[in-house]
Amino acid sequence: MALADPEIVIGPGRLRGRYESGVFAFRGIPYAKPPLGELRFMSPEPPAAWDGVRDAGAFGPPAEQPPGLSGATAPRGNAFPGNSGEWLTVNVWTPDLGASGLPVMVWIHGGAYMFGSSAEPVYDGGRFAMAGVVLVTCNYRLGVEGFGQIPGAPANRGLLDLVAALRWVAENIEAFGGDPGNVTVFGESAGAGAIAALLAMDGSGDGEAAESATGSNSAGWNDASGLFRRAIAESVPGTFFTPRLAADVTSAIAEEAGVPPTYEALAAADPALLAAASARVTARMREFGRWGAVRLTDTPFSPVVDGAVLPRAPWRALLAGAARDIELLTGHNRDEYRLFIVASGRLGKITEEDAATVLDAFAPAPDGPAGYRNGHPGASPGRLFELVFSDWLFRMPTLHLAQAHAVSGGTTYLYELRAEAPALDGVLGACHGLDVPLLFGPPAPGTRPGISDMLLGGSPPASLIALGDQMRGDWIRFATDGDPGWSPYGTEHRTTRIYDMPPDVLSYPEETSMRLWQRHRFGVLELSC
């Protein structure tokens, strides 16, 4: 006999969810008011209460965005059915509405701070809930809406959305059986970068000017401390911007859209117009020499170290002791940048000139490009291109975050994923994003295509699925009691969990890259003129 649709009461009102495959699911729950009209480009405001029963059977729409690499077939922006700007929503899966004290895990999706949606099939929280976790996913503002640097508006609105979502969890998760005192945030790529920023957002920034501009007088509006106990950051990007660089990028997008780069003009512009302009600017980023190394990427948006919302870059904040009481699990995939080389059609086509360009741009002092060439004798231009991009963008920022946290006295765990994606005859290797479908598991049959199909193919081997089950179990153990099953990372022993077939525990394996980058200090990326 089928169970009736479950109903619960939270702060703003009554919700009706669904009972699906042994767990309870509630989707599209607003955690803030729609950020349009007078609230466009403002810090998030608490959601309005509602009368009667609100149906929570469908996902809310994501912020306006162009199609992206991950899950490119997912509905986006105004193409999403019923998109009326109600972008700021959460989704909750729970094993037992009558339970109490269950560990809570909050997933923050990636997508270059420009695209992505909690409605992606790969982010289904059912497997986590079946293992005894209350799993939360959320949407947040992206692109110009969330990370454009706009006069008279707070920076990092996407990060402020995430703080608001975590406050919603703290206030409401008990109704779903969760423990608000045992919350773990986890995310991948831009989601991991957002988590790194949240670790540094302790409310110490000078928010007076931003509060004046936004009218916000809510205590803790820019303070993430106390909202989560543990953090899992998968493939942390090294891109954090200065306000000048972020403002210049926003001005270029405004010019592309045909509007002045002012608050009034941008707030009056259709979100779809700005998203389309962002995509066109992304396609020609190499023309903007003043953007420095950023011009060689496809990431025109990043968190902004503005001194108010985000006081310091995460590496420096953690080294100074920020978030020392937060237990951190972080790691990366071995072949991070391979995904982007394959997706761009450049596999096997990288020239010596291409390799020299990125080595000159990214290889750190004192060795510079020679360090990579000497450290990898006989490596092809394509291999050098991939290595330095992987290191600069993901691998070394992740390692340095782990080191900063460990040196300051924080409990830190490190991993590297080495198992390879089976799709496309294995050319992707252990590429960026592979950890996501492994953790969440393959979507149900008949689900629309997405990143799982792109990376795992139609019939992934049982051994790879089992490895994903093990990773999920380790993540859940960490979220439950802080112990994923291997020893903490330290600068002497560098203990690292290797997710391969079979798994292992070794000293950090990327020794050449670690040595080349040991004197580098990740911080903020500047405008070059």
PLM ranges: what are they?
Residues 1-156, 216, 297, 449-485, ...:
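Non-catalytic accessory segments of hydrolases
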Residues 21, 25-49, 342-362, 489-495:
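Short Gly/aromatic-enriched secondary-structure transition segments
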Residues 28, 70-263, 285, 317-340:
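Serine-hydrolase-like catalytic core of hydrolytic proteins
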Residues 65-80, 122-124, 130, 154-155, ...:
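A structural signal for the main folded, soluble domain(s) of proteins
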Residues 97-101, 173-182, 260-261, 405-413, ...:
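Surface-exposed helix-capping loop/turn segments at secondary-structure junctions
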Residues 105, 134-137, 163-166, 170, ...:
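Non-transmembrane alpha-helical segments in soluble domains
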Residues 265, 274-461, 474:
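Substrate-gating cap/lid region and adjacent catalytic-acid/histidine neighborhood
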Residues 485-509:
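Mature extracytoplasmic/periplasmic domains
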